[in-house]
């Protein structure tokens, strides 16, 4: 089986999301890469499920809050951009202040 670089990146994101969710379920606060992985994964899956860019931009701000992440992490992510594949093509999802 051969994966393209994009497919490998998506698989790594799935693994990072899984690890971050397991740590979160143990009561640990998320670090920067873990927070980005969770939000990015949810955006990709939402696009796959057929949600619109506008819906995902709104949903992206509801996934995590400051209590979920280590101190300072929310300030490190002023904007998050995720390129996702929608039924009508690839689009860029921009989430302003994803962790509030």
Swiss-Prot record:
EC number, as in UniProt: 3.5.1.5
Signal peptide positions (record): none
Family: Belongs to the urease gamma subunit family.
Assembly behavior: Heterotrimer of UreA (gamma), UreB (beta) and UreC (alpha) subunits. Three heterotrimers associate to form the active enzyme.
Name used for this protein in its record: Urease subunit gamma
Protein's gene: ureA
Pathway: Nitrogen metabolism; urea degradation; CO(2) and NH(3) from urea (urease route): step 1/1
Catalyzed reactions: urea + 2 H2O + H(+) = hydrogencarbonate + 2 NH4(+)
Cellular component GO terms, alphabetical: cytoplasm
């Amino acid at each position: 089986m051969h994966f393209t670089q994009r497919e490998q990146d998506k698989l790594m994101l799935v693994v990072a999301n899984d690890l971050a969710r397991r740590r979160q379920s143990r009561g640990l606060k998320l670090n920067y890469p873990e927070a980005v992985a969770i939000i990015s994964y949810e955006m990709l899956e939402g696009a796959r499920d057929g949600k619109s860019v506008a819906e995902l931009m709104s949903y992206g701000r509801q996934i995590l809050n400051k209590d979920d992440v280590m101190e300072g992490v929310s300030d490190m992510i002023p904007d998050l951009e995720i390129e996702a594949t929608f039924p009508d093509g690839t689009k860029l999802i921009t989430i302003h202040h994803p962790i509030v």
